[in-house]
Design a protein with these regions (language model features):
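Gly/Ser/Thr-enriched, mixed-charge loops and adjacent short helices
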Residues: 104-228
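Phosphate-binding and adjacent anionic-ligand microenvironments
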Residues: 270-448
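Short glycine-rich phosphate-binding loop at a beta-alpha junction
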Residues: 39-45, 169-171, 273-277, 316
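N-terminal small/polar loop signature for handling phosphorylated ligands or for N-terminal nucleophile
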Residues: 40-104, 186-246
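Glycine-rich phosphate-binding loop
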Residues: 88-103, 108, 225-247, 252, ...
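An N-terminal, well-structured beta->alpha segment
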Residues: 1-59, 63-65, 89, 145-168
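Proline/glycine-rich low-complexity loops and linkers
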Residues: 78, 122-154, 158, 248-321, ...
């Protein structure tokens, strides 16, 4: 049996041909054998198939003698938080995040919300599922519902000094995913005025898949910010593990520039800490971390790598330009809620707009943003690029793909971990024209 839904970091596939209730039950059985003793936390997103998949997963776990803690409709980060907070043996979030309508999936963790990836148990679970011919067993363990979010909400609010927050007007676009529920629970504790866009959870996604990176989805948030004179806007994907920012002019802020800002916000509270970042774009992050008295630590991109590096380095914060932000006190997990609270505090305390906070950084280190290339032969394409620039003798780093530093500009070129693509990022030291030239040059070389 081939099981294409098992990816490097999670399970994702079309329902029902690649992921269904029978497979979910068998995943529960296989997961039970992978974990230390203790209960398992389960939660699900707003997708229509998610509750049934979670129920089947629960049946498999309980038939294997595992007690289940059902936290219901939630965000991925809530499964991470509750797994750690309740000292559970593991947790599973049933979600397909921003994938197409007919998809669903699962994100799995063991104790302390440690990721279960291909090399830390996920492919072993896949192989067990493929070999499982037994029918459903009778549940021998219990399931309890635990939908109280108090501890999670208190933890989120602990990141900011509420007495310093100003009455900001914020556009919040949940994309009909789960983020709106948490915004509403936080709202009574905050002085903000919220302009709610596509706020109600709706697994039919009447306004499109909640992927804020799609141009049409960006436009909705940007327009709402401008029309309402908001201080800034925030948009989330369906399971709200990523959040995206728009300044008061409606301009989308590249995730890269948020990493440096959030690092400074965290380092102000935890001086001298280490900050883990990915190699795709680095100069701005390194400078802002060092200016704030922190220590930047380079790490391969991908949540499993970032979390592992943060643990080994005892880092206070980790940030990826892909809008994943990780916090030590949050079980080293990523959160889409903590970042906007920190940015709100930063804007309130500094008296500066988000646009003002990032403008100088964007001028100092302009970047291309990530550009994806579908190429027939990835190795040949990369070789063409490296051969072209060999005479310039760049400083090379292989932490994640190839990073080439030419002094006044640099690029990172890497294969996608999840798709058949080459991903390019270019940045310069304050030279927008050079950025344009080099980006076009490399793009032409990659296309052959």
């Amino acid at each position: 049996m081939t099981l294409p839904a098992f990816k490097a970091y999670d399970i994702r596939g079309r329902v029902p041909d690649e992921l269904n209730e029978d497979l979910a039950r068998r995943i529960g059985v296989a997961l039970a054998a992978q974990l230390d003793q203790g209960p398992v936390v389960l939660g699900h997103d707003v997708r229509l198939a998610s509750p049934a998949l979670q129920e089947a997963l629960s049946a498999g776990l309980r038939a294997s003698g595992r007690d289940v803690i059902d936290i219901g409709l939630c965000g991925t980060e809530e499964v991470y938080f509750q797994t750690d907070y309740l000292k559970a043996a593991g947790g599973v979030m049933v979600t397909a995040s921003h994938n197409p309508m007919d998809y669903n999936g699962m994100k799995l963790v063991r104790e302390q919300a440690r990721p279960i990836s291909s090399d830390t148990g996920l492919f072993a679970i896949r192989d067990t599922v493929a070999a499982d011919t037994a029918g459903p067993g009778e549940p021998t363990a219990s399931e309890q519902s635990r939908t109280d979010k108090t501890a999670y909400l208190e933890h989120l609010l602990s990141y900011v000094d509420r007495s310093t927050l100003k009455p900001l007007k914020l556009v919040v676009n949940a994309g009909n995913g789960g983020a709106g529920l948490i915004v509403d629970l936080l709202a009574p504790h905050l002085p903000f005025e919220f302009v709610r866009v596509f706020h109600e959870p709706d697994g039919n996604f009447p306004n499109g898949i909640p992927n804020p990176l799609l141009p049409e989805n960006r436009d909705t948030t940007a327009k709402a910010v401008k029309d309402n004179g908001a201080d800034f806007g925030i948009a989330w994907d369906g399971d709200f593990d990523r959040c995206f920012f728009f300044d008061h002019t409606g301009r989308f802020i590249e995730g890269y520039y948020l990493v440096g800002l959030l690092a400074q916000a965290i380092l102000a509270k935890q001086p001298g800490g280490k900050v883990v970042h990915d190699p795709r774009l680095t100069w701005n992050t390194v400078e802002q971390v060092e200016e704030a008295g922190g220590i930047p630590v380079l790490c391969k991109s991908g949540h499993a790598f970032i979390k592992e590096k943060m643990r080994s380095e005892n880092a206070v914060y980790g940030g990826e330009m892909s809008a994943h932000h990780y916090f030590r006190e949050f079980a080293y997990a990523d959160s889409g809620m903590i970042p906007w609270l920190l940015i709100s505090e930063l804007v309130s305390q500094s008296g500066r707009s988000l646009a003002d906070l990032v403008e100088a950084r964007m001028q100092k280190f302009p970047c291309s943003g990530e550009i994806n290339f579908k190429v027939a032969d990835a190795k040949a394409s990369v070789a063409r690029v490296m051969e072209h620039y060999a005479s310039l003798s760049p400083e090379l780093d292989y932490t994640d793909g190839i990073s080439a530093d030419f002094g006044q500009w640099r690029f990172n070129l890497r294969s996608s971990n999840t798709e058949p693509l080459l991903r390019l990022n270019v940045e310069t030291r304050g030279d927008a024209a050079l950025l344009e030239t080099r980006t076009q040059e490399i793009s032409a070389l990659l296309r052959g």
